[in-house]
């Protein structure tokens, strides 16, 4: 009798790991993008929570005037934020080991870079994971394409804008009031409200909300009755049923008569593509606009564009907006510079002519 002893193949462990990572039978799909997504998002989330609760003040402007952002240093949920890295750091990569001490790293806002860079890698991988799962299931890739809009927006405010401005201190703070401060300063310095790409983004977001509400209300109003008056209409739908749950002809007829015939879709597929494409394209344009304004190609300037026959300026809303911009810029970093850049660049006329 001969006994054959075969060495266990070490490749089996790797093959089992590959099958587990790419299996669509798992409760949560991991995927190869998920292998990188999970640790990066966990790192960003953990550091954000710790920094939001207890990070010391950060010298954001690089002028030895630290700004407090954490809860333990006097802030609340509304005013709290992870303060961006110091202007003294600029665009330098600033991991913990580049600082002389942990205190220096915290003082210069190192956690902001750690959170933002890990977060961006994580959301990029999440988008890739959406594509990967769609591929495994034989689906089309439009879920990942739609998700690319908020990914592009996050990349614009957290990475592209700081690169264009020359410092991570110009990035968006990670907090509620910090976000509003970022928006006001962005308007003051770049006149974003007068940029056509931002206007397309507003149309995309508000239009998408309107179309979503219209579609949902039309479907809900034209459900095919499958229940009695005493039962909930939701019980009339069975998951996976083949027949339609609402009457698209009735919805089409109603909407066509409410506005006009060709305002209503008669194809469910083209309708849902439109509902997805409208806000996505709008947010794409907004992200592109922020990326353009990052390099100071700003919104339109119509200040003092209308004058009467005597040469006197006839004020418009553009002039009102310009005055508001100057006021916001005066208040921004008021200890870092004395005047808004727009005023400082203007040649001062002498008070007395000789």
UniProtKB/Swiss-Prot annotation:
<keyword id="KW-0148">Chlorophyll</keyword>
<keyword id="KW-0472">Membrane</keyword>
<feature type="transmembrane region" description="Helical">
    <location>
        <begin position="142"/>
        <end position="156"/>
    </location>
</feature>
<feature type="site" description="Tyrosine radical intermediate">
    <location>
        <position position="161"/>
    </location>
</feature>
<feature type="binding site">
    <location>
        <position position="170"/>
    </location>
    <ligand>
        <name>[CaMn4O5] cluster</name>
    </ligand>
</feature>
<dbReference type="Pfam" id="PF00124">
    <property type="entry name" value="Photo_RC"/>
</dbReference>
<comment type="subunit">
    <text>PSII is composed of 1 copy each of membrane proteins PsbA, PsbB, PsbC, PsbD, PsbE, PsbF, PsbH, PsbI, PsbJ, PsbK, PsbL, PsbM, PsbT, PsbX, PsbY, PsbZ, Psb30/Ycf12, peripheral proteins PsbO, CyanoQ (PsbQ), PsbU, PsbV and a large number of cofactors. It forms dimeric complexes.</text>
</comment>
<dbReference type="InterPro" id="IPR000484">
    <property type="entry name" value="Photo_RC_L/M"/>
</dbReference>
<feature type="binding site">
    <location>
        <position position="333"/>
    </location>
    <ligand>
        <name>[CaMn4O5] cluster</name>
    </ligand>
</feature>
<feature type="transmembrane region" description="Helical">
    <location>
        <begin position="118"/>
        <end position="133"/>
    </location>
</feature>
<keyword id="KW-0479">Metal-binding</keyword>
<feature type="site" description="Cleavage; by CtpA">
    <location>
        <begin position="344"/>
        <end position="345"/>
    </location>
</feature>
<keyword id="KW-0813">Transport</keyword>
<keyword id="KW-1133">Transmembrane helix</keyword>
<feature type="propeptide">
    <location>
        <begin position="345"/>
        <end position="354"/>
    </location>
</feature>
<keyword id="KW-0157">Chromophore</keyword>
<feature type="binding site">
    <location>
        <position position="272"/>
    </location>
    <ligand>
        <name>Fe cation</name>
    </ligand>
</feature>
<feature type="binding site">
    <location>
        <position position="215"/>
    </location>
    <ligand>
        <name>Fe cation</name>
    </ligand>
</feature>
<keyword id="KW-0249">Electron transport</keyword>
<feature type="binding site">
    <location>
        <position position="215"/>
    </location>
    <ligand>
        <name>a quinone</name>
    </ligand>
</feature>
<keyword id="KW-0359">Herbicide resistance</keyword>
<keyword id="KW-0604">Photosystem II</keyword>
<dbReference type="GO" id="GO:0009523">
    <property type="term" value="C:photosystem II"/>
</dbReference>
<dbReference type="GO" id="GO:0010242">
    <property type="term" value="F:oxygen evolving activity"/>
</dbReference>
<keyword id="KW-0602">Photosynthesis</keyword>
<feature type="binding site">
    <location>
        <position position="332"/>
    </location>
    <ligand>
        <name>[CaMn4O5] cluster</name>
    </ligand>
</feature>
<feature type="binding site">
    <location>
        <position position="126"/>
    </location>
    <ligand>
        <name>pheophytin a</name>
    </ligand>
</feature>
<dbReference type="InterPro" id="IPR055266">
    <property type="entry name" value="D1/D2"/>
</dbReference>
<keyword id="KW-0560">Oxidoreductase</keyword>
<dbReference type="GO" id="GO:0005506">
    <property type="term" value="F:iron ion binding"/>
</dbReference>
<keyword id="KW-0408">Iron</keyword>
<comment type="similarity">
    <text>Belongs to the reaction center PufL/M/PsbA/D family.</text>
</comment>
<feature type="binding site">
    <location>
        <position position="344"/>
    </location>
    <ligand>
        <name>[CaMn4O5] cluster</name>
    </ligand>
</feature>
<dbReference type="InterPro" id="IPR055265">
    <property type="entry name" value="Photo_RC_L/M_CS"/>
</dbReference>
<feature type="binding site">
    <location>
        <begin position="264"/>
        <end position="265"/>
    </location>
    <ligand>
        <name>a quinone</name>
    </ligand>
</feature>
<keyword id="KW-0106">Calcium</keyword>
<keyword id="KW-0812">Transmembrane</keyword>
<feature type="binding site">
    <location>
        <position position="189"/>
    </location>
    <ligand>
        <name>[CaMn4O5] cluster</name>
    </ligand>
</feature>
<dbReference type="GO" id="GO:0031676">
    <property type="term" value="C:plasma membrane-derived thylakoid membrane"/>
</dbReference>
<keyword id="KW-0460">Magnesium</keyword>
<dbReference type="GO" id="GO:0045156">
    <property type="term" value="F:electron transporter, transferring electrons within the cyclic electron transport pathway of photosynthesis activity"/>
</dbReference>
<protein>
    <recommendedName>
        <fullName>Photosystem II protein D1 1</fullName>
        <ecNumber>1.10.3.9</ecNumber>
    </recommendedName>
</protein>
């Amino acid at each position: 009798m001969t006994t054959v002893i075969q060495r266990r193949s070490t490749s089996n462990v790797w093959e089992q790991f590959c099958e587990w990572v790419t299996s669509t039978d798992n409760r949560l799909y991991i995927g190869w993008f998920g292998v990188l997504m999970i640790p990066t998002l966990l790192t960003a989330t953990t550091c954000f929570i710790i920094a939001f609760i207890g990070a010391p003040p950060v010298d954001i402007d690089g002028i030895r005037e630290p700004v407090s952002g954490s809860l333990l240093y006097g802030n609340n949920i509304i005013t709290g934020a992870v303060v961006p890295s110091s202007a003294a750091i600029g665009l330098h990569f600033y991991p913990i080991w580049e600082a002389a001490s942990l205190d220096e790293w915290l003082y210069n806002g190192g956690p902001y870079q750690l959170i933002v860079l890990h977060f961006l890698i994580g959301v990029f991988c999440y988008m890739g994971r959406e594509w990967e799962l769609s591929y495994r299931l034989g689906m089309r890739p439009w879920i990942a394409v739609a998700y690319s809009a908020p990914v592009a927006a996050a990349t614009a405010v957290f990475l592209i804008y700081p690169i264009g401005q020359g410092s991570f201190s110009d990035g968006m703070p990670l907090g509620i009031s910090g976000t509003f401060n970022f928006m006001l300063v962005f308007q003051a310095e770049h006149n974003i409200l007068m940029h056509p790409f931002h206007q397309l983004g507003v149309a995309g977001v508000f239009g998408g909300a309107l179309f979503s509400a219209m579609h949902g209300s039309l479907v809900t109003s034209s459900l095919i009755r499958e229940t009695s008056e005493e039962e909930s209409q939701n019980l009339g739908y069975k998951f996976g049923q083949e027949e339609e749950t609402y009457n698209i002809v009735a919805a089409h007829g109603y909407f066509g008569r409410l506005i006009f015939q060709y305002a209503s879709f008669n194809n469910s597929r083209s309708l849902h593509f439109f509902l997805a494409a409208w806000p996505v394209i709008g947010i794409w344009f907004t992200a592109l606009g922020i990326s353009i304004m990052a390099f100071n190609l700003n919104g339109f300037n119509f200040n003092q564009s209308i004058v009467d026959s005597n040469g006197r300026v006839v004020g418009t809303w553009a002039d009102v907006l310009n005055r508001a911009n100057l006021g916001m810029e005066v208040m921004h970093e008021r200890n870092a510079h004395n005047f808004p850049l727009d005023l400082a660049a203007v040649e001062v006329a002498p008070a007395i002519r000789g």
